[in-house]
C-alpha cells in the first residue's frame, strides 16, 4: 500500500465508487429522509467513498451488513446479532485463555465455515448464477425507505462532533482559563469513574451504546415513546377529573335519596306506630278474673275494662283493687317493731296528743276521694311496673305530707298555748301517765279477750294488717 504514487490509487478508486453506486445498498442512501439537508447527503457520500477506497470490496460488504444490523431494519437479525455480540463480549471478558488461543480458535472456525460452504454450494455455480442475475436483473425496492441509513446517522454524528470541536476551539480562544478548568474537571470525573467502575463494564456500555443508539435514532423511538406517554397522561388527567365529578354526583344523589327515605319513614311511623309485643302481653294480663276487653285510644295505648263493666270514676270495682294494691305494697315496707305493740304505743312514739285523732280522721277522709279517683283513673290506663311504683309513691307522699302538716300545725298551736298559760303541775303529769297506763292495760286486756273468744282468722289478719300499716305511718312520722 505504501506506493510512491497515491494519486493513481485515488483516481482509480474514485471511478470504482462511481461504478459501484448502482449497487442495491447505495440507492437507499440517496433516498434519505426529507428532513436531511444537502450537507448531510454530501457527507454521507464522502464517507461511503472513503470507506470503499480504504477498505475494499469485502470490508465494504461487511460494512453494509453491519449497517443493516445496526439500523434494525430486520429486527430478528438485529436481535440475534445483539445477543451474539453480548455472548462474545462476556466470553472474551471471562475466559482464562490467552490471546493467541483465541486467534487460533477464530481461524479454525473460519476454515470450517469455508469447507462447509464449498461442500454445500459449488463455488462455480454460485458465481455463474450471481453474474447472470447481476447482469440481467436489477433489484429495486418497491417500498420507499423513510428511515435514515447508518451512513446518514454516522455523517450526522460526525457533523455534530465537528461543530462541537469548533465551538470548543472558539471557547478556548475567548477564555483559556475556563477551558482549562473544564478539561481538568472532565478528566477528573473520568478518572474517578474508572477507579470505581471496571473497564469491562465501561466496554460493555460502549457496546450497548453502539447497538441501541442507532435503534433509537433511526426509528425515532424517542419521539414515539414521548407521543404515547403524552397521550396516556392526557387520558389519565381527563379520567381523574371525570372520576371526581362522577363521585360528586353519586354522593349528591345518595344524600337526596337518604333525605327522601327519612321523610317517608317519619310519615309511615306517624301513620302506623309500632307496638311492642311484651307491652301488649302485660296489658292483656292485667285482669285475673275475666277476659279483658281491649280498645284502641287516641294516644296509641290499650284501654282495659275488667269484666265488661263500664269505666266510671266512682266504680266500686275500681276502688277495691286500688285499696288492695295499696295495702299489699304497704305490707312490703319494713317497720321497726314488725307490727308489735298497740295503736296507742305508736301514737305515743309520735309525741302527738290524743286530740289529734279526729283531725287525722277528717284529713284522711278528705283525701280519700281524691286518692280513689286517682286509683280509678290509674287502673283505666295500662299499668306498667314503673307506673304502679310511681302511683304508690305519689299516694304515700300525699298521706305523709298531710299528716306532717297537721302535726306541725298542732304542735305550733300547742306551743303557743303553753307559752300563754302556766306550766302544768306534777300532779297533772302523774294523772296523765296513769290515764295512759290505764288505756294501755285496757287495750291489752281487750286483745286478750278477743283472742280468747276465738275470732275468725280473717278478722285477726285484718287487725294485724291495720296495726302494721298504722305502725309504719306512725314510725315514719316519728322519724321526721
Curated annotation (Swiss-Prot):
Residues 1-41, 302-348, 450-480 are annotated as: Disordered. Its main location: Golgi. GO terms for molecular function: endoplasmic reticulum-autophagosome adaptor activity. Residues 1-10, 317-331 have a biased composition (Basic and acidic residues). It is a multi-pass membrane protein. Residues 1-43, 100-101, 213-480 are cytoplasmic. Residues 302-313, 454-473 have a biased composition (Polar residues). Residues 65-78, 123-191 are lumenal. One of its GO terms (biological process) is sensory perception of pain. Residues 67-216 are annotated as: Reticulon homology domain. A motif (LIR motif) lies at residues 436-441. GO terms for cellular component: cis-Golgi network; endoplasmic reticulum; endoplasmic reticulum membrane. The modification Phosphoserine is found at residues 132, 134, 136. The chain crosses the membrane at residues 44-64, 79-99, 102-122, 192-212. The keyword Cell wall biogenesis/degradation does not apply. The LIR motif interacts with ATG8 family proteins and is necessary to target the ER fragments to autophagosomes for lysosomal degradation. The reticulon homology domain provides capacity to bend the membrane and promotes ER scission. It is required for homooligomerization. This domain does not show relevant similarities with reticulon domains, preventing any domain predictions within the protein sequence. Homooligomer; oligomerization is enhanced following endoplasmic reticulum stress and is mediated by the reticulon homology domain. Interacts with ATG8 family modifier proteins MAP1LC3A, MAP1LC3B, GABARAP, GABARAPL1 and GABARAPL2. Endoplasmic reticulum (ER)-anchored autophagy regulator which mediates ER delivery into lysosomes through sequestration into autophagosomes. Promotes membrane remodeling and ER scission via its membrane bending capacity and targets the fragments into autophagosomes via interaction with ATG8 family proteins. Active under basal conditions. Required for collagen quality control in a LIR motif-dependent manner. Required for long-term survival of nociceptive and autonomic ganglion neurons. Belongs to the RETREG family. This is Reticulophagy regulator 1. The lineage of its organism: Eukaryota, Metazoa, Chordata, Craniata, Vertebrata.
Amino acid at each position: 500500500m505504501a506506493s510512491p504514487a497515491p494519486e493513481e490509487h485515488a483516481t482509480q478508486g474514485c471511478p470504482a465508487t462511481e461504478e459501484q453506486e448502482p449497487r442495491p445498498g447505495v440507492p437507499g442512501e440517496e433516498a434519505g429522509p426529507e428532513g436531511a439537508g444537502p450537507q448531510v447527503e454530501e457527507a454521507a457520500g464522502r464517507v461511503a467513498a472513503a470507506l470503499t477506497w480504504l477498505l475494499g470490496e469485502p470490508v465494504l460488504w461487511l460494512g453494509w451488513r453491519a449497517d443493516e444490523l445496526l439500523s434494525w431494519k430486520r429486527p430478528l437479525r438485529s436481535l440475534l446479532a445483539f445477543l451474539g455480540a453480548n455472548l462474545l463480549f462476556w466470553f472474551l471478558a471471562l475466559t482464562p485463555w490467552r490471546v493467541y488461543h483465541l486467534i487460533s480458535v477464530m481461524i479454525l472456525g473460519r476454515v470450517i465455515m469455508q469447507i462447509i460452504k464449498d461442500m454445500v454450494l459449488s463455488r462455480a455455480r454460485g458465481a455463474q448464477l450471481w453474474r447472470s442475475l447481476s447482469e440481467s436483473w436489477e433489484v429495486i425496492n418497491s417500498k420507499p425507505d423513510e428511515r435514515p441509513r447508518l451512513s446518514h446517522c454516522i455523517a450526522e454524528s460526525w457533523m455534530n462532533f465537528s461543530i462541537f470541536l469548533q465551538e470548543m476551539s472558539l471557547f478556548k480562544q475567548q477564555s483559556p482559563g475556563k477551558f482549562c478548568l473544564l478539561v481538568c474537571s472532565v478528566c477528573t470525573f473520568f478518572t474517578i469513574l474508572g477507579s470505581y467502575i471496571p473497564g469491562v463494564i465501561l466496554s460493555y456500555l460502549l457496546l450497548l451504546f453502539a447497538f441501541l443508539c442507532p435503534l433509537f435514532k433511526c426509528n425515532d423511538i424517542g419521539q414515539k415513546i414521548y407521543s404515547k406517554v403524552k397521550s396516556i397522561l392526557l387520558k389519565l388527567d381527563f379520567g381523574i377529573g371525570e372520576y371526581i365529578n362522577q363521585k360528586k354526583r353519586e354522593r349528591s344523589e345518595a344524600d337526596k335519596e337518604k333525605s327522601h327515605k327519612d321523610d317517608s319513614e317519619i310519615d309511615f311511623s306517624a301513620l302506623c306506630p309500632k307496638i311492642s309485643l311484651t307491652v301488649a302481653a302485660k296489658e292483656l294480663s292485667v285482669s285475673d278474673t275475666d277476659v279483658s276487653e281491649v280498645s284502641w285510644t287516641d294516644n296509641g295505648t290499650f284501654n282495659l275494662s275488667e269484666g265488661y263493666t263500664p269505666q266510671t270514676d266512682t266504680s266500686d270495682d275500681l276502688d277495691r283493687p286500688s285499696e288492695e294494691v295499696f295495702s299489699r305494697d304497704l305490707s312490703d315496707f319494713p317497720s321497726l317493731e314488725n307490727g308489735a305493740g298497740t295503736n296507742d304505743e305508736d301514737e305515743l312514739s309520735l309525741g302527738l296528743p290524743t286530740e289529734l285523732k279526729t283531725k287525722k280522721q277528717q284529713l284522711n277522709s278528705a283525701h280519700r276521694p281524691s286518692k280513689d279517683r286517682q286509683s280509678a283513673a290509674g287502673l283505666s290506663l295500662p299499668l306498667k311496673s314503673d307506673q304502679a311504683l310511681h302511683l304508690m309513691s305519689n299516694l304515700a307522699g300525699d298521706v305523709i305530707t298531710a299528716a306532717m302538716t297537721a302535726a306541725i300545725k298542732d304542735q305550733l298551736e300547742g306551743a303557743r298555748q303553753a307559752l300563754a298559760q302556766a306550766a302544768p303541775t306534777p300532779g297533772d303529769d302523774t294523772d296523765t301517765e296513769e290515764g295512759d297506763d290505764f288505756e294501755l292495760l285496757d287495750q291489752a286486756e281487750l286483745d286478750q279477750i278477743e283472742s280468747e273468744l276465738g275470732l275468725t282468722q280473717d278478722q285477726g289478719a285484718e287487725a294485724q294488717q291495720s296495726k302494721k300499716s298504722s305502725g309504719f305511718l306512725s314510725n315514719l312520722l316519728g322519724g321526721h
